[in-house]
């Protein structure tokens, strides 16, 4: 017995002590994988900077984006006084791009948030209950998927009228089926797991199973898709504004700025270059961030 206790104590002494701060939580594992992706980290920093700029745009902008007019420098290019130049009405393009970030980013995020909320609910119901719930919801999604997203958005705005609020609604509508299908697929897989059967066996209600067990299992997929969908929504909102169906002049929305710049593209290309560059960099950043989140949350599908 003494020999046994001695050996047991020797084994315990040989085991390394694990301090509380050395315990690897899922969050630590996620952060460890994510910070190794330099492109995703750069994109994340850009998105954070963009959000800060959007929040404080009215205070950061050196000039009033809508009511400042420099009639002595119409269509002039970039200078120390006007970093991005001046448009045909004498407005400072740098100030308008900054304030446009506030409008374009808000439109993209709110549209995706609405689409994600409704789509997630429909996907949970379709995947969990199946039967006629599944058939009804999926047939509606099939109908919405039958139309190109921008065409569907144009139709919705044509009915509701122009304006940034209606653009958000239109973009949200064609985001709903994408989230519904994503969540439905995850729900169909999760509902077959043993922990779901265990929850049912102890009398958990359908609402409890959906909200406490199935929904948390779909969060990572939703977050990744949400991030990547923001870029698509920003492009869609800008496209509608470019067509004259979204934000109306003098609102400094990026798509509306491109629409106003069409007449001066030849003599003052900078008027269109900077809003277009803002759209490009923002969409690229959200896509790279989404890729990085996907690889960090589920390293098995990397590559």
UniProtKB/Swiss-Prot annotation:
Indicate where this protein resides in the cell.
Cell inner membrane
Question: Which membrane topology describes this protein?
Answer: Multi-pass membrane protein
Keyword Transmembrane assigned to the entry: answer is: yes
Please list the GO biological process terms of this entry.
glutathione transmembrane transport
The record, for CDD domains, names: TM_PBP2
Keyword Transport listed? The answer is yes
**GO CC annotations on file:** ATP-binding cassette (ABC) transporter complex, substrate-binding subunit-containing; membrane; plasma membrane
Please provide the record's keywords in A-Z order: Cell inner membrane, Cell membrane, Membrane, Transmembrane, Transmembrane helix, Transport
TM region(s), chain numbering: 40-60, 105-125, 144-164, 165-185, 222-242, 266-286
Q: What is its main location?
A: membrane
Domain ABC transmembrane type-1, by residue range, is 101-290
This entry's Gene Ontology molecular function terms read: dipeptide transmembrane transporter activity; glutathione transmembrane transporter activity
Entries under NCBIfam families matching the protein: PRK15082.1 (NF011662)
This protein's assembly is summarised as: The complex is composed of two ATP-binding proteins (GsiA), two transmembrane proteins (GsiC and GsiD) and a solute-binding protein (GsiB). In the presence of glutathione, interacts with the glutathione-binding protein GsiB.
According to its UniProt entry, the function of this protein is described as: Part of the ABC transporter complex GsiABCD involved in glutathione import. Probably responsible for the translocation of the substrate across the membrane.
What protein family is recorded? Belongs to the binding-protein-dependent transport system permease family.
Name under which the protein is recorded: Glutathione transport system permease protein GsiD
């Amino acid at each position: 017995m003494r020999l046994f206790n001695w050996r047991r104590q020797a084994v315990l002494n040989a085991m390394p002590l694990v301090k509380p701060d050395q315990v690897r939580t899922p969050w630590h594992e996620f952060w460890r994988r994510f910070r190794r992706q330099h492109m995703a980290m750069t994109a994340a920093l850009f998105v954070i900077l963009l959000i800060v700029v959007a929040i404080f745009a009215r205070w950061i902008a050196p000039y009033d984006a809508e009511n400042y007019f420099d009639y002595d420098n119409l269509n002039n290019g970039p200078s120390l006084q006007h970093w991005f130049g001046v448009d045909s009405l004498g407005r400072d393009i740098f100030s308008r791009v900054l304030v446009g970030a506030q409008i374009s980013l808000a439109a993209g995020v709110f549209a995706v948030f609405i689409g994600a909320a409704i789509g997630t609910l429909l996907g949970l119901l379709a995947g969990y209950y199946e039967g006629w719930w599944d058939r009804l919801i999926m047939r509606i999604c099939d109908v919405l998927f039958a139309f190109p997203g921008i065409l569907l958005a144009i139709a919705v705005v044509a009915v509701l009228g122009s304006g940034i609020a209606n653009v958000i609604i239109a973009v949200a509508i064609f985001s709903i089926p994408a989230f519904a299908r994503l969540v439905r697929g995850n729900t169909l897989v999760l509902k077959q797991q043993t922990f779901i059967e265990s929850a049912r066996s102890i009398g958990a209600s359908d609402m409890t199973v959906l909200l406490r067990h199935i929904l948390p299992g779909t969060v990572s997929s939703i977050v990744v898709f949400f991030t990547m969908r923001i870029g698509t929504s920003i492009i869609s909102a800008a496209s509608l504004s470019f067509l004259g169906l979204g934000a109306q002049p003098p609102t400094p929305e990026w798509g509306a700025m491109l629409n106003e710049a069409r007449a001066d593209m030849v003599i003052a290309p900078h008027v269109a270059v900077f809003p277009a560059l803002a759209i490009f960099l923002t969409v690229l950043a959200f896509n790279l961030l989404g890729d990085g989140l996907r690889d960090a949350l589920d390293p098995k599908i990397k590559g």
